[in-house]
Amino acid sequence: AVIPLQEGQPVHIGSWIFNAERRIVQQGAFSDLLRLSKEDPYCCLMDSEKVLPPITIRCAKKGERFAPIGMNGKSQKLSDFWINRKLPRQLRSLYPVIADRERILWIPGFQSADPCKITPETVEVLYIQAVLAE
C-alpha cells in the first residue's frame, strides 16, 4: 500500500507512527540541524526544495535503488543496503520507506537520501519523525 504523508497529520501504519512538518531554518542553525539529524535515526531532516511531492510511505519495490548520505550521490540496490545493515530477510519486504514521486527519501532507523540532504544553503527543512511503538 502507498499511504500519503501530509504535514501535521500523524499516520499510523502497523506499529509505526509518522509525523511530518516543514520548518524554516533560522540563521546559523545549520550545525544544530545537522547534529539533530545524526543523533536520532528515527528523525529525518531534508531540504524541502529538493523533495518532489507527493510524499508517501510505502514498502520498497523489487530492484529499487537508494542513494544514502555518505555515498556521494551514488546509489545501491536496496537489497544490498538491507544486507549491509543486517536487516533480517523476513522484515525487508514489510519495512516502510519514505519516498517522493521519484525516489526513496529516507529509510526510518537508517540514513536519508543524499540528493535531499540539508546544506548551509537550506532555507526550509522537511522534518519527518518515525516512532516505533512497543
Regions found by a protein language model. Give the residues of each.
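AMP-forming adenylation/ATP pyrophosphatase catalytic core
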Residues: A1-E134
